UniProtKB/Swiss-Prot annotation:
Molecular function in Gene Ontology: hydrolase activity
Tissues expressing the protein: Strongly expressed in stigma.
EC numbers, comma separated: 3.1.-.-
Gene: KAI2IA
Active site: 95 (nucleophile), 217, 246
InterPro entries documented for this protein: AB_hydrolase_1 (IPR000073), AB_hydrolase_fold (IPR029058)
First-level EC class: hydrolase
Coiled-coil residue windows: none
GO cellular component: cytoplasm; nucleus
Summary of the function given for this chain in its UniProt record: Hydrolase involved in the olfaction of sesquiterpene volatile organic compounds (VOCs) during volatile plant communication in a MAX2 proteins-dependent manner. Acts as a karrikin-insensitive receptor that stereospecifically perceives and binds to (-)-germacrene D, particularly in stigmas, and triggers a signaling cascade influencing plant fitness, as the result of reproductive organ growth-promoting effect; this process involves an interaction with MAX2 proteins (e.g. MAX2A and MAX2B) and the subsequent degradation of SMAX1a, a transcriptional corepressor.
Listed name of the protein: Karrikin insensitive 2 receptor IA
């Protein structure tokens, strides 16, 4: 971890007996939680970190082989918890990081009291028995567009994912953090995420899971959250919030933050109501 600590920006703030660890998704960094953190610091110890490859990290140290699968990110997360001597945490992961939490919790279930999964998907590409929202050809076209002109790709991709136009603050913020990534790293991470199939991991998860997503998300159809719920190995609950876009914590914080706070503070009860 000492080497990892030099590469990944880890921030620990707040006070409280319980620890909340926040993991961000593709194209963002820990700043994506800026609307949530002020509501946590009085009651919780809060840990924020940047995934390797995110803008604030040193691109020269990005290991393309290590991060060609989510296990690399999961090992980083476990190393952070070990270094900070965290023996139990509430883990809130967005998109990519929600599945990182899934894998890490399989390796070390004792370290996680629960997972909160925001805009999560175990597979983005459709299969015969599964609707992920994309065809392989869609991903190939997006990858090609990224490779051809990264800046132009961001201008088209960011509004679609956020669910707004280029003038919106959330789209501008997502565009900024996307642009901060080195293009070849962004392309590698994009391909890793959009071609993985982690469905087989779900049944091995024993930690309670809170699954939250927007009612309209271009990247994650509502059916995906229900699929996760039905296939997890432990207790789980789904909440679909009346927001649009893949990053509701950024685009609609007034709706999303109260929901996240409720799931952080309340556990799943026997009647599956948070």
């Amino acid at each position: 971890m000492h080497q990892l600590k030099k590469l990944i920006t880890v921030k620990v703030i707040g006070s409280g007996e319980k620890t909340v660890v926040l993991g961000h998704g593709f194209g963002t960094d820990q700043s994506v939680w800026k609307h949530l953190v002020p509501y946590l610091v009085e009651d919780y110890r809060v840990v924020l970190y940047d995934n390797m490859g995110a803008g604030p990290t040193n691109p020269d140290y990005f290991d393309f082989e290590r991060y060609a699968s989510l296990e690399g990110y999961a090992y980083d997360l476990l190393a952070i918890l070990e270094e900070l001597q965290i023996d139990s945490c509430i883990y809130l992961g967005h998109s990519l990081s929600s599945m990182t939490g899934v894998i890490a919790s399989i390796f070390r279930p004792d370290l996680f009291s629960k997972l909160i999964m925001l805009s999560a998907s175990p597979r983005f590409i459709n299969a015969d028995d599964y609707y992920g929202g994309f065809e392989k050809e869609d991903i190939d076209q997006l990858s090609q567009a990224m490779d051809t002109n990264y800046k132009s790709w961001i201008e088209g991709f960011a509004p679609l994912v956020i669910g707004g136009d280029m003038d919106s603050v959330a789209v501008q913020e997502f565009s900024r953090t996307l642009f901060n990534m080195r293009p070849d790293i962004a392309l590698s991470v994009f391909r890793t995420i959009f071609t993985f199939d982690l469905r087989h991991f779900l049944c091995r998860v024993t930690v309670p899971c809170h699954i939250i997503q927007s009612s309209k998300d271009l990247a994650v159809p509502v059916a995906v959250s229900e699929y996760i719920h039905q296939n997890l190995g432990g207790k789980s609950i789904v909440e679909v919030i009346s927001t649009e876009g893949h990053l509701p914590q950024l685009s609609a914080p007034e709706v999303t933050i109260p929901v996240l706070l409720r799931h952080i503070s309340h556990d799943i009860t026997s009647n599956a109501a948070p």
